[in-house]
């Protein structure tokens, strides 16, 4: 399969301006494709991974991957369908640019990759030059019809955000000129901005200039929810914001209805292997064989093989209940979302500990659960109601992990 056929099979193609022309251009020699991202945060998240997966496939097909960090456009903000974006300070933008650049470098490597900042050319563009060289090439009537602009006309859109599509068009032309970029990749909501860039290239370079646009379908799960969040929280690519274990678990916990779609889109596995995993999922529903492979592949791509090994080691320990030898970092990682309570480092009777931490509603219930073997403290079952808990001896003196019954966890945090 060629690049386009592969995208179609993977469900990763929404629109393309000239399919035959793009295939011909890719076959004729190395061309570049680009994805742009504005540094609105200090880390990429799963939403960014959607266009980056297509760009990585383009790179694997022999093309050059170009990533724009929007140092200039990030100071303005791509228009939202409903409200104006909050502007960031120059200092915050620079910090965000640094974090995103490090992540992109890890994903794409150094070969056949260019990471550029549009502040290098937009930052030097005077208002007079902008109006004379570019403004005259854009029709207000056409710009008003772009979906994201049209949706804001009633509620109001600033001139700043209105001109964003011109700046994105300038980006495409600059990359066309500097890096032989002939393809822009974006989400389905970027179609208007992408075609504006193609029109600008044709206006400046002539209608024979080869420039293409490709958009990706909106990614949703089987229930129709927008992909990329876990219980309302963004899944970040920065391991300090979303740990590799949490990242791994996000993929492992995908439903049987979604897993094949995500295997196609977010991994580089071939047709036969994915078809085999799909068949295994059908033959053994709930077995999570396909989910495990999905989690392994995506975690390896983003965080590396060691992160996969560490995540699976932690998962195995949690599944078996053998948590006594985990590190404090592992405990914070795996149990950060369970009910928690503050404790001191001083010793305390287990019954008082359970009641004070609201693990148990009464001392009577606490004594009963301890006596019946329903209470486990940091991996060790406690059956003596006179047992004293010494927080300094648990997980580097940072946590005490309580399990009531088989699955109900609570975390005491030393303050």
Curated annotation (Swiss-Prot):
A GO term for molecular function: tyrosine-tRNA ligase activity
Predominant place of localization: cytoplasm
Domain S4 RNA-binding residue range list: 348-415
Keyword Chloroplast: no
Residue interval(s) of motif 'KMSKS' region: 226-230
Catalysed reactions, as listed in the record: tRNA(Tyr) + L-tyrosine + ATP = L-tyrosyl-tRNA(Tyr) + AMP + diphosphate + H(+)
Keywords for the protein's UniProt record, in alphabetical order: Aminoacyl-tRNA synthetase, ATP-binding, Cytoplasm, Ligase, Nucleotide-binding, Protein biosynthesis, RNA-binding
Location of the protein in the cell: Cytoplasm
Pfam family, one: SYY_C-terminal
Gene Ontology terms describing biological process: tyrosyl-tRNA aminoacylation
EC nos: 6.1.1.1
Motif ('HIGH' region): 39-48
InterPro entries the record matches: aa-tRNA-synth_I_CS (IPR001412), aa-tRNA-synth_Ic (IPR002305), Rossmann-like_a/b/a_fold (IPR014729), S4_RNA-bd_sf (IPR036986), SYY-like_C (IPR054608), Tyr-tRNA-ligase (IPR002307), Tyr-tRNA-ligase_bac-type (IPR024088), Tyr-tRNA-ligase_bac_1 (IPR024107)
Keyword Cytoplasm found: yes
Binding-site list for L-tyrosine: 34, 164, 168
Superkingdom: Bacteria
HAMAP family in the cross-refs: Tyr_tRNA_synth_type1
NCBIfam families the record matches: tyrS (TIGR00234)
Family: Belongs to the class-I aminoacyl-tRNA synthetase family. TyrS type 1 subfamily.
Assembly information from the UniProt record: Homodimer.
Function, as annotated: Catalyzes the attachment of tyrosine to tRNA(Tyr) in a two-step reaction: tyrosine is first activated by ATP to form Tyr-AMP and then transferred to the acceptor end of tRNA(Tyr).
Protein name stated in the entry: Tyrosine--tRNA ligase
